[in-house]
């Protein structure tokens, strides 16, 4: 097969590991900078062009769309879909997961556990919003934030009101979320492919920081997840419609809670922490799906 890897960063560990996984299974891997693609949208033969050349002959793509280019990245993925190319994560599912509010609403609809979350537009709703999520301390998140950036822990009601007022004054969209104190600055990252959790690790934030993102200095360790956590991670990925995803889970006194579903999860941290390859299962899943599409067989993931 000819597999395109949509990534702005060809030298990144994640990109290189995907290339290696494709090649090790006998496939041609082509790294494509998403932002260098341009499209011919017509009713006869839609096409994608890249640095002066039409991209043809692809069986599948693996989107690694950075959050900062979600709109354009989804347009490129959608164009590949229109050309009949299989996308490991389709454009609609990527867009769903990137919209934090929509993602939480989808999880809510499926009855999947998550921290109580509030969303408002007017400053005069702030006191009720704070009470709605259980009062301070609470977490305030920018909807557009990624990798722990734009996330604030407000220790008191006064601090929460000040931060929320400041964000709303800047016309920023924010979520107000209950603080799960018992998680103690840690979460569990599950790497899911299809209907399987391939690997999982516990991420612990640095001393004094409630955010556990490895990009912010957190550290990872191997963790054994429960059957409930495994089932919940897979259900969260299915709620988004994704195939490949990282699911972040908080352990709370009332059971596991989904914090986020990431459509382009980091590969380096979880592979180096667990010693488990997560890239080969991605390619194996693509092989199965492409073969099923060619023979029109029912797809059993």
From Swiss-Prot:
Q: Enzyme group, top EC level?
A: ligase
Which PROSITE patterns does the record cross-reference, listed alphabetically? Answer: ATP_GRASP
Details of cofactor binding: Binds 2 magnesium or manganese ions per subunit.
Q: Which residues bind ATP?
A: 141, 178-179, 187, 211-213
Database matches in InterPro entries: ATP-grasp, ATP-grasp_RimK-type, ATP_grasp_subdomain_1, RimK, Rimk_N, Rp_bS6_RimK/Lys_biosynth_LsyX
Q: Where does Mn(2+) 1 bind?
A: 248, 260
According to its UniProt record, which cofactors does this protein need? Answer: Mg(2+); Mn(2+)
Highest taxon of the lineage: Bacteria
Instruction: Tell me where in this chain the ATP-grasp domain is found.
Output: 104-287
- At which positions is Mg(2+) 1 bound? 248, 260
- GO BP terms: protein modification process; SOS response; translation
Q: Which residues bind Mg(2+) 2?
A: 260, 262
**What does the entry list as the binding residues for Mn(2+) 2?**
260, 262
Q: Which GO terms describe its molecular function?
A: ATP binding; metal ion binding; ribosomal S6-glutamic acid ligase activity
Q: Keyword Repeat: yes or no?
A: no
Q: What is its EC number?
A: 6.3.2.-
> Sorted alphabetically, which Gene3D superfamilies does this protein's record hold?
3.40.50.20, ATP-grasp fold, A domain, ATP-grasp fold, B domain
Could you say which residues form the signal peptide?
Answer: none
> What would be one Gene Ontology cellular-component term for the protein?
cytoplasm
Q: Which Pfam families match?
A: RimK, Rimk_N
Record keywords, A-Z: ATP-binding, Ligase, Magnesium, Manganese, Metal-binding, Nucleotide-binding, Protein biosynthesis
Belongs to which family? Belongs to the RimK family.
Name the record gives this protein: Probable alpha-L-glutamate ligase 1
Source species: Shewanella baltica (strain OS155 / ATCC BAA-1091)
